[in-house]
Amino acid sequence: MSIRVWAMIETARAVLHAEELAAASRDSEMRLAGFVFGPNDLSRETRIRMRPGRAAMIPMITHCILATRAYGLEILDGPYSDLGNTDGFGQECAQGRDLGFDGKTLIHPGQIEACNAIFTPPADEVTQARKILAAFERPENASRGAISLDGQMVERLHADMAKRTIAIADAIAARAH
Protein backbone atom coordinates (compact mmCIF):
# COMPACT_ATOMS: atom_id res chain seq x y z
CA MET A 1 0.00 0.00 0.00
CA SER A 2 1.39 3.36 -1.01
CA ILE A 3 0.60 6.42 1.06
CA ARG A 4 -0.43 9.38 -1.08
CA VAL A 5 0.41 12.95 -0.08
CA TRP A 6 -1.27 16.29 -0.71
CA ALA A 7 0.73 19.48 -1.25
CA MET A 8 -0.48 22.62 0.48
CA ILE A 9 -0.43 25.57 -1.91
CA GLU A 10 -0.25 28.44 0.53
CA THR A 11 2.63 30.67 -0.56
CA ALA A 12 3.23 32.93 -3.53
CA ARG A 13 6.11 30.69 -4.62
CA ALA A 14 3.91 27.60 -4.47
CA VAL A 15 1.34 29.28 -6.74
CA LEU A 16 4.04 30.44 -9.14
CA HIS A 17 5.49 26.90 -9.25
CA ALA A 18 2.17 25.02 -9.23
CA GLU A 19 2.79 23.45 -12.62
CA GLU A 20 6.25 22.21 -11.61
CA LEU A 21 4.85 20.81 -8.38
CA ALA A 22 2.03 19.05 -10.25
CA ALA A 23 4.49 17.70 -12.82
CA ALA A 24 6.38 16.04 -9.98
CA SER A 25 3.40 13.70 -9.62
CA ARG A 26 4.72 11.84 -12.67
CA ASP A 27 7.57 10.61 -10.46
CA SER A 28 6.22 7.49 -8.72
CA GLU A 29 8.39 8.21 -5.69
CA MET A 30 6.58 11.52 -5.09
CA ARG A 31 3.18 9.90 -4.38
CA LEU A 32 1.48 13.26 -4.97
CA ALA A 33 -2.32 12.91 -5.03
CA GLY A 34 -3.19 16.56 -5.33
CA PHE A 35 -3.14 20.06 -3.94
CA VAL A 36 -4.92 21.76 -1.07
CA PHE A 37 -5.33 25.46 -1.80
CA GLY A 38 -4.46 27.47 1.33
CA PRO A 39 -6.18 30.85 1.06
CA ASN A 40 -5.47 32.10 4.58
CA ASP A 41 -1.68 31.77 4.49
CA LEU A 42 -1.68 32.99 0.91
CA SER A 43 -3.71 36.02 1.92
CA ARG A 44 -1.24 36.81 4.70
CA GLU A 45 1.77 36.46 2.43
CA THR A 46 0.36 38.34 -0.56
CA ARG A 47 -1.57 40.92 1.50
CA ILE A 48 -4.73 40.09 -0.43
CA ARG A 49 -7.76 40.80 1.69
CA MET A 50 -10.17 37.94 2.14
CA ARG A 51 -13.48 39.26 0.84
CA PRO A 52 -16.70 37.48 -0.11
CA GLY A 53 -16.36 36.18 -3.65
CA ARG A 54 -12.54 36.05 -3.41
CA ALA A 55 -12.19 38.15 -6.59
CA ALA A 56 -8.53 39.00 -5.97
CA MET A 57 -7.68 35.34 -5.40
CA ILE A 58 -9.47 33.88 -8.45
CA PRO A 59 -6.41 34.10 -10.77
CA MET A 60 -4.33 32.11 -8.28
CA ILE A 61 -7.11 29.58 -7.76
CA THR A 62 -7.59 28.97 -11.47
CA HIS A 63 -3.83 28.73 -12.02
CA CYS A 64 -3.60 25.97 -9.42
CA ILE A 65 -6.67 24.18 -10.78
CA LEU A 66 -5.19 24.24 -14.30
CA ALA A 67 -1.91 22.83 -13.00
CA THR A 68 -3.64 19.93 -11.26
CA ARG A 69 -5.84 19.12 -14.24
CA ALA A 70 -2.87 19.19 -16.62
CA TYR A 71 -1.33 16.36 -14.59
CA GLY A 72 -4.45 14.45 -13.58
CA LEU A 73 -4.44 15.50 -9.94
CA GLU A 74 -7.21 16.46 -7.53
CA ILE A 75 -7.47 19.82 -5.78
CA LEU A 76 -9.32 20.83 -2.63
CA ASP A 77 -10.40 24.32 -1.72
CA GLY A 78 -9.15 25.70 1.57
CA PRO A 79 -11.19 26.30 4.70
CA TYR A 80 -13.85 28.92 5.30
CA SER A 81 -13.12 30.59 8.62
CA ASP A 82 -16.34 32.49 9.44
CA LEU A 83 -18.07 29.68 11.31
CA GLY A 84 -21.18 31.75 12.01
CA ASN A 85 -21.80 32.68 8.38
CA THR A 86 -23.56 29.64 6.92
CA ASP A 87 -24.75 31.55 3.84
CA GLY A 88 -21.21 32.72 3.08
CA PHE A 89 -19.92 29.19 3.59
CA GLY A 90 -22.47 27.81 1.15
CA GLN A 91 -21.65 30.48 -1.41
CA GLU A 92 -17.93 29.77 -1.16
CA CYS A 93 -18.51 26.00 -1.50
CA ALA A 94 -20.66 26.58 -4.60
CA GLN A 95 -18.06 28.95 -6.03
CA GLY A 96 -15.31 26.40 -5.41
CA ARG A 97 -17.32 23.63 -7.05
CA ASP A 98 -18.04 25.85 -10.06
CA LEU A 99 -14.37 26.85 -10.36
CA GLY A 100 -13.38 23.18 -10.50
CA PHE A 101 -12.35 22.22 -6.97
CA ASP A 102 -13.00 18.58 -6.10
CA GLY A 103 -14.00 19.38 -2.54
CA LYS A 104 -13.24 21.65 0.38
CA THR A 105 -11.23 21.30 3.57
CA LEU A 106 -13.39 21.87 6.63
CA ILE A 107 -12.61 23.16 10.09
CA HIS A 108 -15.86 22.39 11.91
CA PRO A 109 -18.17 19.37 11.97
CA GLY A 110 -21.10 21.71 11.34
CA GLN A 111 -19.76 22.36 7.83
CA ILE A 112 -19.78 18.73 6.64
CA GLU A 113 -23.43 18.31 5.65
CA ALA A 114 -23.68 21.58 3.70
CA CYS A 115 -20.38 20.97 1.92
CA ASN A 116 -21.34 17.42 0.96
CA ALA A 117 -24.70 18.62 -0.36
CA ILE A 118 -23.06 21.26 -2.55
CA PHE A 119 -20.34 18.99 -3.97
CA THR A 120 -22.77 16.10 -4.58
CA PRO A 121 -24.04 16.10 -8.17
CA PRO A 122 -27.77 16.99 -8.21
CA ALA A 123 -30.18 14.18 -9.14
CA ASP A 124 -31.17 15.84 -12.43
CA GLU A 125 -27.50 16.12 -13.42
CA VAL A 126 -26.96 12.43 -12.66
CA THR A 127 -30.07 11.51 -14.65
CA GLN A 128 -28.82 13.53 -17.62
CA ALA A 129 -25.36 11.95 -17.30
CA ARG A 130 -26.88 8.47 -17.42
CA LYS A 131 -28.93 9.48 -20.47
CA ILE A 132 -25.79 10.75 -22.26
CA LEU A 133 -23.90 7.53 -21.55
CA ALA A 134 -26.82 5.39 -22.68
CA ALA A 135 -27.05 7.37 -25.94
CA PHE A 136 -23.36 6.85 -26.73
CA GLU A 137 -23.61 3.14 -25.87
CA ARG A 138 -26.21 2.56 -28.59
CA PRO A 139 -24.67 0.63 -31.51
CA GLU A 140 -25.51 3.37 -34.03
CA ASN A 141 -23.56 5.92 -31.93
CA ALA A 142 -20.57 3.75 -30.95
CA SER A 143 -18.17 5.35 -33.43
CA ARG A 144 -19.57 8.87 -33.40
CA GLY A 145 -17.74 11.78 -31.85
CA ALA A 146 -20.93 13.82 -31.47
CA ILE A 147 -24.66 13.08 -31.44
CA SER A 148 -27.93 14.94 -31.13
CA LEU A 149 -29.74 14.33 -27.84
CA ASP A 150 -32.95 16.14 -27.00
CA GLY A 151 -32.15 18.79 -29.60
CA GLN A 152 -28.67 19.44 -28.20
CA MET A 153 -25.32 18.53 -29.69
CA VAL A 154 -23.53 16.22 -27.27
CA GLU A 155 -19.89 15.32 -27.84
CA ARG A 156 -17.97 12.31 -26.62
CA LEU A 157 -16.23 14.62 -24.12
CA HIS A 158 -19.65 15.08 -22.50
CA ALA A 159 -19.81 11.30 -22.08
CA ASP A 160 -16.46 11.44 -20.28
CA MET A 161 -17.81 14.17 -18.02
CA ALA A 162 -20.98 12.12 -17.48
CA LYS A 163 -18.89 9.11 -16.36
CA ARG A 164 -17.22 11.26 -13.72
CA THR A 165 -20.56 12.65 -12.52
CA ILE A 166 -21.99 9.15 -12.20
CA ALA A 167 -18.86 7.84 -10.45
CA ILE A 168 -19.07 10.63 -7.87
CA ALA A 169 -22.80 10.09 -7.31
CA ASP A 170 -22.36 6.32 -7.02
CA ALA A 171 -19.44 6.68 -4.57
CA ILE A 172 -21.47 9.04 -2.39
CA ALA A 173 -24.49 6.72 -2.50
CA ALA A 174 -22.31 3.74 -1.54
CA ARG A 175 -20.94 5.59 1.49
CA ALA A 176 -24.46 6.46 2.63
CA HIS A 177 -25.34 2.76 3.00
What feature does the model see in each segment?
Residues 1-177:
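Expand to "…catalyze enediolate/carbanion chemistry for C-C bond making/breaking, isomerization
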